[in-house]
């Protein structure tokens, strides 16, 4: 627990810092929950403020309404009889009394008589009549038989309620007030009373029951029932889980980039990791939770469930969501779709919870379903809504309801269950890296007791010695140094360790039964060719990959069962950088210091500062890691490995890869300083590095241990004397006769000598020990004939480690093949000319193969959209149709008995004798009424809201001095027909009290006359259409976003850039992607088309409109997504963001359009429709998703696309199908054109370049080197004479006054990367760029390749101006980036085939060319495996091969030998010597030996400026000061070796800090008294041989000159 506590604080600080670095993401995490819950409350608030009308409204007014251009239809079978006509006359009388100004003719025209009901129906439905008809009255044949007067009121069926229904909770009786029903009813009733001599003017009004939802919480009832009950759980889940979207993406990215496993290898406790992420996430998550609970409770949306109960539900639910996020992360290895998929899964579960909450299943089953917490929250949402609604009987009683406390219990149980699941999955699912435990691990004793394996003795070591285990086919006991038994026990013991990988060619053995021991205070180096198993061994020791067999002990713990204990003591610097680009150097070091044992914050800060200074990052402490150069990142990773008091086992893989000579020596000193009390395993390809640093060296080839021992042991075992290295002048490289002459001279003096290698300018000879007496004579002759033999210099040393390595590897199968015929096939197969169709073929093959290999992503990108679309189709065909108007014409007698035996409260205002008598004789006579005092009526109705259909209030009112009997009908909203029934009841009772007769009123609706909107809605399920359109937009948004993610990935990994530089036409790149992505998208289109045509005849009928729309839509959304991808560098983030934009914009535009269009139709407003058209034009122009949704709506006849002035007939008219299709076509053109304009921007700018647009390059320094100044003169003459171009191009590369300044961004200051460089490089020359990290080498190559735009200056390639004729200038260039731009899902063979087609190699030659490169680079064994699994060195081989394909005239090689072994490096030198015969090559390197071996001319750069320029010898002559003597002392002379050496060479001086046993001296060579090499060798052999293990003598080396010239560089601030 102590370790968890110690790690928790730094993890929290790291996570919080990372969260705080991205202000936008943090803001979104806070805003997204608010937006989600805000949308819910916006909808709910609208439902609350759109309240019912509670005002008193007139139910009378017949005479007033009919007089305003309205007609009343009246009739009876055979015509009106006398009684019926009396009623008609009294109706006319009412009009004439109300409007005495109207003539009788006018009044008569207001009434239309009919003799049969069919004629009345026909008249009503005539389009020319129905707008002027207020309704009709029909008298049945028995209308005046007996004591009942019968008549029927006829209005449009949509102006009444469904006569077959008596109750409903969404409508009320106000519809009868608004559409003249009650006006006709009261008018006819008044006429009947007059006919029966009852001359009481009656005025009726209607009013909804007083709102029973008095309290604020009650006002939410409608929204609570319609919205919160059905969608609340999903909204709450969405609002809370949105906070975790970033967490999921970041965790999966940490897995993907090996950062997570890197932390684990250095002791990270998984529990601490999850706890720290939980705490940081819970800060925002719980804030959102508290906010949601406060909103729900404070708004009183949730009322009967207390706030504390809400908190007790939402907090554990938030925790379960967090745990679900962690669990889902275990199943994602790529960040592409992780966040989005997790979000959809959780929302889906929450949606299922809505169904379960409402479903009448047993409480036990409901609680069991709550094991999925998103289901639980939806069930809880149902419970708290239910509690608030049951008060008003708004929901039916559910006997299977669970209570909120049971749900709280389940959520708490879920927390513990999910923790258990996470613990289990964390052990058995490790992803790509890490060792998974067996599924039954928790049942084993080893897991709980941490037992050692049986072959380990009590001292924590293996019983079997390592040497007895190494018994492979190539085993030779003499090659293994015996370990002194007095040494302490080994800290690392490896026994029979083996690892096999499955590849395209079957199983490949990476490590073959390795057995070895390592000890404290010692550095153990692994040497071997690329892919020999070195990094794989380290990965097994750190637990990143599982051994196939064998075991290893580290500090007594075995790696199979106790890896967690081992990791507490590890410091690891892997081959790839495991850093967060947002964190600073100091933040990295402080974090890992805390992770590895420093508990005091001040101590961490001091240690971090100290170690940063020692690795040369002192002034970068506060710089984000993303701004560091490649070499600086390696320094940071090395510092991370060493920091911490518990790091006593250090594993470092290529620590100085990419570092210049000066910084490399700095790192050597650092490693030696920190070696004490540590066991260090070093993997490196710098043999000098291993020689200087290592106590023990193991050489591995083909996964087998070939030898093991100290450097001296290996040299004595494999060396047979001295190594003579002769550097020839560059003009004699291909002179085989010269090589023979030099060899003859040497063999004449040393008959037993042998030629070891002839690579580039370098000749290496083996001179046996017994011939040492002949050395002086040999050196004397070489000195005398130095010019004649074209020898620049020579040196001699005792057997070097490099020689040992080359000798051992030369006997293995890993040696690259310099077969001349193979070389010619590979390097001299020229491009036959770039062909568009060939490039297109290559790119399409690439997409097919990457999709096939990443089948999970491919299936998900297709399957998920298909599933979403399938859901839309299911809803479209199966969702219940909702009628938007009432079609029921069945008659309904408006009788009080419709609502049973309910008692009606009656109130009388101003009680007097007349009113009392009227009440007693009429309504009061009924046993269905009860008298309630007026001042108590309001409260009575509120408290008796349920179960009372209506109430009555009576008083007398005056209008124009006429006294009226007024009664107000209070109607309950749930009783659909209450208002006309109560009017009938009152009027009938008044008639009965006087005549004994009753009135029977019947509602007999006309068949509904459909409006244009309703005509458009015939047989249309508009709710189903809305869901179908939404889910269709979602599916296409997702697939379009997934395609954009691929583009972002290729751009961020620079694959796209390399393709362009290799000659790919940009239009072909986009065409290939469009073709493949269109094909993939059309899988979705075909699925949609087949299904929708099969199930819906509308799509069959209008197939032309649908198919044109979906095809144009597909053609438009892909390029739009490509365009949007330019703003993203991460695949996962691109997919998530682009999906949200596509779907969100399309959905919002569609909803707005539908609302506006429906409003225009309902209001029959041409002007509003015009405004809607303008808005839609804008939507069309912005979003193709809106265009397609409109087409779907048109085909499905959605009412929201109808028009006021146009019949919905012509599907291809302008405003219907034509316009969106035309706009979609324009979208295709616009987005593709926009992409090409962006991509071709450099070419376009070049065509219209104005020289003034370029900044003037800075004026060269006054003290500029004379050779650099002379080069400016030469280049100016070349440019003035236009010496370039044509097939005979002499200078393929010319750049003049080249200048690049990076402007300041944010906190980063502006920087001049290249000051003012001028060079001309002819064909046949290899030009070397040397310089410190960050001096401008890679920037120079970037400008030459066109990747970086220069700030000023001019570049000419192959005779063409790069700015003005970009395409021609870049026609024949090969580029090898500093960081491999390889497609991880393709093998070496597949990538080479791709670039052969890109560069125009003839199809018939591709196979042979690719085979030649694979054979030449020794890649046969892995040629069919994906390059993502290659070692760094093998990746460099592939990258160099790509650059060389097609025999380009210009090669730009950036650190080509970085990370490759010595054998391959020498092979590359030979390749370069062969290549340069007809090419101009620029090589950047940190290997001085490489520069000397292959470069005809070189420059040393410092702070963007050229400091020296010329051949190797010229620079040595100009800046050197004599001879350089490098020595390695015997151990016993470590203290006084320098002093003894200076005694023998008094004029010498120590020119570099001593590194362990190695030292470098400078010996002046004055021109007036020159010293011969032979005399130096003689002096060493006679006076110093006894104190030296090794030495070499040469002219002052380029490396020493390099260190001298770059000593005060601002890019080398720490030196």
UniProtKB/Swiss-Prot annotation:
Q: Which residues form the ABC transporter domain?
A: 492-727, 1293-1528
- Topological category with respect to the lipid bilayer: Multi-pass membrane protein
A GO molecular function held by the record: ATPase-coupled transmembrane transporter activity
Q: Does the keyword ATP-binding apply?
A: yes
**Residue positions binding ATP 2:** 1331-1338
Arranged from A to Z, the UniProt key words for this protein are: ATP-binding, Membrane, Nucleotide-binding, Repeat, Transmembrane, Transmembrane helix, Transport
Primary subcellular site in the record, as a coarse category = membrane
Query: GO cellular-component terms in the record?
Result: intracellular membrane-bounded organelle; membrane
Task: Establish whether keyword Transmembrane is in the entry.
Answer: yes
Q: Where does ATP 1 bind?
A: 528-535
Q: Could you list the residue ranges that cross the membrane?
A: 30-50, 233-253, 278-298, 308-328, 337-357, 365-385, 405-425, 855-875, 1022-1042, 1075-1095, 1106-1126, 1135-1155, 1174-1194, 1218-1238
GO biological process, any: lipid transport
The record's comment on protein family reads: Belongs to the ABC transporter superfamily. ABCA family.
Provide the protein name: ABC transporter A family member 4
């Amino acid at each position: 627990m102590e370790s968890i506590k110690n790690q928790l604080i730094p993890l929290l600080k790291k996570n919080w810092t990372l969260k705080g670095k991205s202000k936008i993401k943090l803001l979104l995490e806070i805003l997204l929950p608010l937006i989600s819950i805000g949308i819910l409350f916006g909808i709910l608030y609208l439902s609350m403020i759109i309240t019912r009308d509670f005002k008193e409204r007139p139910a009378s007014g017949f005479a007033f309404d009919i007089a305003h251009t309205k007609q009343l239809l009246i009739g009876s079978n055979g015509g009106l009889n006398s009684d019926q006509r009396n009623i008609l006359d009294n109706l006319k009388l009412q009009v004439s009394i109300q409007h005495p100004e109207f003539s009788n003719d006018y009044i008569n025209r207001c009434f239309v008589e009919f003799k049969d009901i069919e004629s009345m129906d026909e008249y009503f439905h005539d389009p020319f009549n129905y707008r002027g008809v207020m309704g009709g009255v029909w008298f049945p044949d028995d209308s005046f038989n007996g004591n009942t007067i019968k008549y029927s009121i006829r209005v449009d069926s949509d102006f009444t309620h469904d006569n077959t229904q008596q109750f409903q909770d969404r409508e009320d009786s106000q519809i009868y007030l608004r559409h003249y029903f009650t006006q006709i009813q009261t008018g006819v009733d008044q006429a009947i009373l007059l006919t029966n001599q009852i001359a009481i003017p009656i005025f009726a009004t209607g009013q909804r029951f007083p709102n029973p939802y008095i309290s604020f919480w009650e006002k939410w009832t409608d929204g609570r029932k319609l919205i919160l009950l059905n969608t609340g759980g999903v909204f709450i889940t969405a609002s809370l889980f949105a906070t975790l979207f970033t967490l999921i993406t970041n965790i999966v990215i940490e897995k993907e980039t090996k950062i997570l496993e890197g932390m684990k290898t250095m002791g990270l406790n998984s529990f601490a990791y999850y706890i720290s992420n939980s705490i940081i996430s819970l800060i925002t998550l719980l804030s959102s939770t508290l906010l949601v609970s406060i909103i729900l409770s404070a708004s009183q949306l949730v009322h009967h469930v207390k706030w504390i109960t809400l908190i007790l539900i939402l907090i554990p639910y938030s925790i379960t969501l967090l745990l679900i996020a962690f669990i889902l992360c275990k199943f994602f290895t790529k960040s592409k779709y992780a966040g989005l998929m997790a979000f959809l899964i959780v929302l889906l579960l929450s949606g299922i919870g809505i169904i379960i909450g409402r479903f009448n299943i047993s409480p036990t089953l409901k609680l069991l379903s709550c094991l999925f917490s998103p289901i639980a929250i939806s069930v809880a949402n149902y419970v708290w809504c239910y509690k608030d609604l049951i008060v008003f009987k708004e929901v039916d009683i559910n006997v299977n309801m669970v209570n909120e406390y049971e749900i709280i219990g389940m959520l708490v149980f879920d927390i513990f269950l999910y923790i258990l699941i996470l613990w289990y999955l964390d052990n058995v699912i490790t992803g790509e890296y890490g060792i998974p435990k067996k599924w039954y691990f928790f049942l084993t004793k080893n897991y709980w007791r941490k037992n050692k394996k049986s072959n380990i003795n009590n001292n924590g070591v293996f019983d079997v010695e390592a040497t007895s285990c190494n018994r492979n086919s190539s085993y030779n006991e003499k090659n293994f140094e015996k370990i002194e038994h007095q040494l302490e026990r080994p800290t690392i013991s490896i026994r029979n360790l083996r690892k096999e990988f499955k590849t395209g060619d079957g199983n490949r053995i990476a490590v073959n039964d390795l057995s070895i021991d390592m000890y404290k205070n010692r550095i153990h180096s692994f040497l071997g060719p690329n892919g020999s198993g070195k990094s794989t061994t380290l990965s097994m020791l750190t637990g990143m990959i599982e051994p196939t067999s064998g075991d290893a002990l580290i500090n007594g713990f075995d790696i199979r069962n106790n890896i967690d204990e081992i990791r507490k003591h590890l410091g690891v610097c892997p081959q790839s950088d495991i850093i967060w680009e947002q964190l600073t150097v100091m933040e990295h070091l402080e974090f890992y210091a805390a992770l590895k044992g420093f508990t005091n914050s001040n101590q961490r800060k001091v240690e971090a500062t100290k170690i940063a200074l020692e690795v040369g990052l002192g002034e970068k402490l506060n710089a984000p890691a993303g701004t560091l150069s490649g070499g600086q990142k390696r320094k940071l990773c090395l510092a991370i490995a060493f920091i911490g008091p518990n790091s006593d086992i250090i594993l470092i893989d290529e620590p100085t890869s990419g570092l210049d000579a000066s910084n490399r020596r700095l790192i050597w000193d650092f490693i030696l300083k920190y070696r004490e009390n540590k066991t260090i395993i070093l993997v490196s390809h710098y043999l000098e590095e291993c020689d200087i640093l290592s106590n023990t060296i193991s050489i591995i080839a083909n996964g087998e241990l070939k030898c093991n021992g100290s450097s001296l042991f290996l040299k004595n075992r494999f060396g047979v004397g001295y190594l003579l290295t002769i550097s020839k002048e560059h003009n004699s490289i291909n002179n085989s006769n010269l090589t023979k002459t030099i060899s003859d001279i040497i063999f004449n003096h040393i008959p037993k000598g042998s030629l070891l290698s002839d690579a580039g300018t370098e000749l290496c000879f083996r001179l046996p020990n017994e011939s040492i007496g002949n050395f002086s004579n040999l050196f004397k002759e070489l000195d005398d004939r130095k010019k004649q033999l074209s020898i620049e210099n020579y040196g001699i040393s005792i057997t070097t480690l490099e020689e040992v390595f080359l000798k051992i590897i030369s006997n293995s199968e890993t040696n690259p093949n310099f077969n001349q015929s193979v070389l010619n096939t590979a390097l001299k197969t020229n491009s036959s000319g770039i062909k568009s169709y060939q490039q297109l073929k290559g790119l399409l093959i690439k997409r097919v193969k990457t999709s096939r290999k990443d089948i999970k992503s491919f299936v998900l990108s297709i399957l998920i959209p298909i599933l979403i679309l399938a859901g839309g189709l299911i809803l479209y065909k199966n969702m219940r149709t909702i009628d938007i108007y009432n079609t029921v014409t069945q008659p309904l007698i408006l009788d009080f008995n419709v609502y049973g035996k309910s008692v009606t409260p009656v109130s009388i205002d101003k009680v007097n004798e007349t009113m009392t008598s009227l009440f007693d004789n009429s309504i009061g006579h009924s046993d269905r009424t009860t008298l309630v005092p007026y001042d108590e009526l309001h409260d009575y109705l509120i408290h008796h809201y349920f179960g009372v259909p209506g109430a009555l209030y009576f008083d007398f009112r005056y209008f124009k001095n006429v006294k009226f009997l007024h009664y107000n009908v209070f109607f309950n909203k749930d009783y659909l027909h209450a208002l006309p029934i109560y009017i009938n009841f009152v009027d009938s009772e008044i008639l009965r009290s006087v005549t004994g007769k009753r009135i029977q009123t019947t509602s007999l609706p006309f068949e509904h006359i459909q409006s244009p909107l309703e005509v458009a809605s015939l047989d249309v399920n508009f709710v189903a259409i809305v869901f179908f359109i939404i889910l269709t937009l979602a599916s296409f948004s997702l697939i379009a976003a997934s395609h954009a993610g691929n583009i972002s990935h290729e751009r961020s990994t620079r694959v796209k850039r390399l393709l362009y530089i290799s000659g790919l036409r940009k239009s072909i790149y986009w065409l290939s992607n469009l073709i493949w992505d269109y094909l993939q998208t059309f899988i979705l289109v075909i699925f949609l088309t087949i299904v929708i045509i099969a199930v819906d005849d509308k799509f069959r009928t209008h197939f032309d409109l649908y198919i044109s729309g979906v095809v144009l839509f597909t053609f438009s959304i892909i390029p739009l997504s490509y365009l949007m991808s330019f703003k993203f560098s991460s695949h996962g983030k691109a997919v998530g963001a682009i999906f949200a934009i596509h779907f969100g914009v399309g959905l919002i535009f569609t909803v707005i359009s539908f609302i506006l269009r429906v409003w225009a139709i309902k209001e029959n407003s041409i002007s509003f429709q015009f405004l809607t058209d303008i808005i839609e034009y804008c939507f069309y122009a912005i979003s193709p998703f809106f265009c397609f949704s409109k087409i779907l709506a048109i085909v499905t006849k959605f009412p929201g696309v109808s028009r006021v002035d146009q019949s919905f007939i012509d599907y291809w008219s302008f405003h219907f199908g034509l316009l969106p299709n035309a706009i979609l076509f324009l979208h295709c053109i616009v987005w593709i054109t926009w992409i090409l304009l962006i991509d071709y921007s450099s070419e376009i700018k070049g065509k219209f370049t104005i020289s003034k647009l370029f900044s003037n390059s800075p004026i060269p320094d006054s003290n500029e080197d004379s050779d650099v100044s002379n080069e400016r003169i030469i280049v100016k003459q070349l440019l003035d004479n236009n010496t370039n171009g044509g097939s005979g191009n002499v200078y393929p590369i010319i750049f003049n006054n080249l200048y690049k300044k990076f402007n300041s961004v944010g906190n980063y200051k502006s920087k001049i990367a290249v000051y003012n460089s001028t060079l001309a490089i002819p064909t046949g020359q290899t030009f070397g760029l040397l310089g410190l990290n960050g001096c401008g080498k890679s920037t120079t190559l970037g400008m030459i390749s066109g990747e970086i735009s220069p700030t000023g200056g001019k570049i000419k390639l192959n005779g063409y101006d790069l700015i003005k004729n970009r395409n021609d200038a870049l026609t024949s260039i090969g580029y090898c980036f500093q960081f491999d731009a390889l497609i991880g899902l393709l093998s070496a063979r597949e990538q080479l085939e791709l670039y052969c087609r890109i560069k125009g190699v003839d199809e018939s030659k591709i196979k042979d060319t690719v085979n030649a490169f694979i054979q030449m680079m020794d890649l046969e064994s892995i040629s069919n495996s994906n390059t993502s699994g290659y070692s760094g060195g093998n990746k460099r081989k592939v990258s160099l091969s790509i650059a060389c394909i097609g025999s380009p005239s210009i090669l730009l090689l950036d650190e080509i030998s970085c990370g490759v072994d010595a054998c391959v490096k020498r092979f590359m030198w030979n390749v370069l010597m062969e290549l340069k015969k007809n090419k101009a090559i620029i090589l950047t390197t940190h290997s001085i030996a490489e520069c000397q071996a292959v470069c005809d001319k070189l420059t040393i750069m410092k702070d963007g400026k050229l400091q020296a320029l010329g051949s190797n010898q010229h620079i040595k002559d100009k800046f050197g000061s004599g001879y350089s003597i490098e020595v390695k002392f015997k151990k016993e002379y470590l203290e006084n070796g320098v002093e003894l050496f200076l005694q023998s060479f008094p004029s010498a001086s120590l020119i570099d800090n001593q590194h362990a046993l190695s030292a470098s001296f400078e010996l002046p060579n004055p021109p007036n008294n020159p010293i011969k090499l032979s005399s130096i060798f003689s002096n060493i052999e006679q006076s110093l041989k006894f104190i030296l293990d090794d030495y070499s003598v040469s002219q002052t080396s380029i490396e020493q000159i390099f260190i001298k010239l770059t000593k005060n560089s601002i890019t080398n601030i720490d030196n």
